[in-house]
Amino acid sequence: KDGTVRHVFYGVNPLGIRVYPYGKPTDEEAKHDFLWRLHVNTPKKGMISIFNRSYYEDILVPTVEGYIEKDLIERRYDHINNFEEMLRDNGTIVLKFFLHMSKDMQRERLDERMEERKKNWKHHASDEVVRKKWEDYMEVYEDVFKKTNTKHAPWHIIPTDDKWYKVYLVAKTI
């Protein structure tokens, strides 16, 4: 994801772009609603905000891990659709990209991270744990696409096994 941002926005004035990586919510973020941490980083007029991961993680992980009730997940879908519509109503163009890597390619890249010294820093023990739930995550992603693909914020599903083609498709879409 970081490499895609670097390649696509190479040569663009960095003063107009902010990239926000999201992981597990911090203690402070957890004190607010699940959209808060992203809402505070939405772009000002004329600016670009790039979210590396996003509020969709707050549907994916709890659904796969089973620690939030189904009705709350369904309400989160509604909140997300309303949030994205509000952004559009206020002049923000919402582009959503799902960078899809095949399971075989993911295995290959995870192995590279272990074998190549210069890529070791990218490896996390949790990668293997999450990988074991591949099918569960793909099932939830399908649900996410069905429930949040809207006219004002459509999904763009980008194949990523070929890095150059991924960069081309993202740049072309933008």
Predicted regions and their residues:
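Conserved nucleotide-sensing/catalytic segment adjacent to the nucleotide-binding pocket
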Residues: 14-77
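Switch/connector loops and helix/strand junctions flanking conserved nucleotide-binding motifs
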Residues: 28-31, 57-63, 103-110, 165-168
